[in-house]
Amino acid sequence: MRHGDISSSPDTVGVAVVNYKMPRLHTKNEVLENCRNIAKVIGGVKQGLPGLDLIIFPEYSTHGIMYDRQEMFDTAASVPGEETAILAEACKKNKVWGVFSLTGEKHEQAKKNPYNTLILVNDKGEIVQKYRKILPWCPIECWYPGDKTYVVDGPKGLKVSLIICDDGNYPEIWRDCAMRGAELIVRCQGYMYPAKEQQIAIVKAMAWANQCYVAVANATGFDGVYSYFGHSSIIGFDGHTLGECGEEENGLQYAQLSVQQIRDARKYDQSQNQLFKLLHRGYSGVFASGDGDKGVAECPFEFYKTWVNDPKKAQENVEKFTRPSVGVAACPVGDLPTK
């Protein structure tokens, strides 16, 4: 893991995260023009950082937030589509990989709300991962939720997963990506005040807990509704920050992520190898007791057992100490039911 140079090497993936200014757009043509601007940014960053392998833009950076429901439907993209064609061509032209936001992606059933989607494009201009946000930021966001994570071989073979904004507040999604082999988890977000300190802290904790690299791209600026705090960052698999932006609009950070180092750590680290130890619980004591050398593999957590085997019951259980309705009468949001 290295920070401070503009290069990369056969073993290191050069990663840049962009503090892209949150756009406020209303039409398809405006979205496409913004895509062309993102393409120009890619070219400029590659010129300044010749070692760049992967560039990451925030959630909402392509479309902005469509606060008008009709505009949200009118500007929703297809994958592949006009928007992705512009972004893919920029990746191919500059020989870099890119992560881009589509807010939204058209639902398969036209009348249902769009998805909040990320795509990973390789340096040949091919879409190699499409991820739909599993945990939209309720009660405000009205995206239709996705249903799974993905892991693919990224630049130089580094294994990459994508997650979006509020997803990252749930330890389960980080662990799912890591346990499926992800070495770099990319979190694209359009996070606003007042949650700045919590969001900076959680990505470091999740990198540490899951022994993975984390790259965060966050929006900046004010779109007339929310103020976005930036602080796009790149975190090492030991939980230390390699590089972090401030609140500056269109700032960026860059670091080199070693493929060999993370694989070495996951194989040889012992006391802090959380991924291995979770599935080999108490192996020292089990071995000393003559019960084998693999520890305990079974899940000890009652909540997870219930959730997998009876999700409706798990939902009812949490409602007993939270609330039974999605809406809250004391602070209603839209037309969400409060009873």
Curated annotation (Swiss-Prot):
Domain CN hydrolase: 13-259
Pfam family, one: CN_hydrolase
Top enzyme class: hydrolase
Catalytic residues identified in the record: E59, K133, C165
The keyword Hydrolase appears for this protein: yes
Catalytic activity: a monocarboxylic acid amide + H2O = a monocarboxylate + NH4(+)
Keywords, comma-separated and alphabetical: Hydrolase
PROSITE patterns: CN_HYDROLASE
A molecular function GO annotation: amidase activity
HAMAP family in alphabetical order: Aliphatic_amidase
Role played: Catalyzes the hydrolysis of short-chain aliphatic amides to their corresponding organic acids with release of ammonia. Also exhibits in vitro acyl transferase activity, transferring the acyl moiety of short-chain amides to hydroxylamine to form hydroxamates.
Protein family membership: Belongs to the carbon-nitrogen hydrolase superfamily. Aliphatic amidase family.
PANTHER family per record: ALIPHATIC AMIDASE, NITRILASE C965.09-RELATED
Name of protein: Aliphatic amidase
Organism expressing this protein natively: Helicobacter pylori (strain Shi470)
Gene it is expressed from: amiE
